[in-house]
């Protein structure tokens, strides 16, 4: 049986590695984060809304962010609710589109229906290569929406359609999602 110290070694290593990725993200992404904030402020000041899309864990992050925008991030800083829609939540819409048009269009068709010029699409993809995310970002941009991509590494194919890309400097999807 391993000693308690042996069990702690991988835990410490993982947590220190995660902290290193967060520090590297702060150094590499601060300017792009500020640009994304500027897009969001302009969107909300113009009466727009934020749409969010992603798959798997990224879908969960979309839902969490939408909830925080509609509700409030901190009670210490009161503000009105902000319009935000996670395109990952309506199972009837998702399955109808997937069945009739293919999974690659589950976000694109929702952006086509809901997105308006001045809105912002936040797309989350650890690789930037998810076909349904790429199509959504391309559609949003074609419709006059601004686009923010949260991704890792090189940013993948979605990068070509993003107004702002926040690229976590890590290749491991778990570390990208944590940052």
Positions of PLM-derived features:
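Surface-exposed amphipathic alpha-helices with a cationic face
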Residues: 137-143
